[in-house]
Amino acid sequence: MPEDLESFLRAGTAPVVVTLGSAMAQAGKVFAETAKAALALGRRVVVLTRHPEQLPTLPPEAFVAHWAPLGPLFSRAALVVHHGGIGTTAQAIAGGVPQLILPFAHDQPDNAHILKRHGLGDFHDPHRLRLGRLKAQMQAILASKEIAKACAKRAQMNQNTHGEVLAADSLEQLVEGFSA
């Protein structure tokens, strides 16, 4: 974890993390509206972007970083607002943190619907951002005991899968099939 981000995390309550992936160079409005919504709820915010020049001036309760390790960061977040890419979604699930997905393209809308169906969060159309609706969705997700419970359960399930053992067993079976 970058030292300055670590200091920010230690200095207060769990933040809302906003990230839209590494390819979002023209998402200033999306970053600004999501940060405003979280700040309006009295939440601290971490914005991850490689293009900080697209952001408005943010208050001290917001931290902007070019990069952070998602797993360790997400496990310390109250909510992750993101684009719905499968890698980001998986890291948030593993961290046991609720999610609000803003799906733009590709597999992101499907990932958003699956996430909602499993009770791990919700989604919002990034092309129809409204501060009031974002605030309401964030508040509902943050206040939901059902979502928190589902996120904790899914994270626990991921920890207990021992994927490396399953992969090794599958490879052994495959190799044994070739030698038979």
Where are these regions (language model features)?
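C-terminal amphipathic helix plus adjacent low-complexity
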Residues: 131-180
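Flexible loop/turn segments at secondary-structure boundaries
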Residues: 24-27, 53-56, 88-89, 107-109, ...
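Acidic, glycine-centered active-site loop in nucleotide-sugar glycosyltransferases
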Residues: 60, 95-96, 116-121
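Short hydrophobic alpha-helical runs that function as membrane-insertion/retention elements
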Residues: 45-47, 100-101, 122-124
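A donor-sugar binding/catalytic signature common to diverse glycosyltransferases
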Residues: 65-114
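Donor-nucleotide binding loops and adjacent catalytic segments primarily
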Residues: 1-79
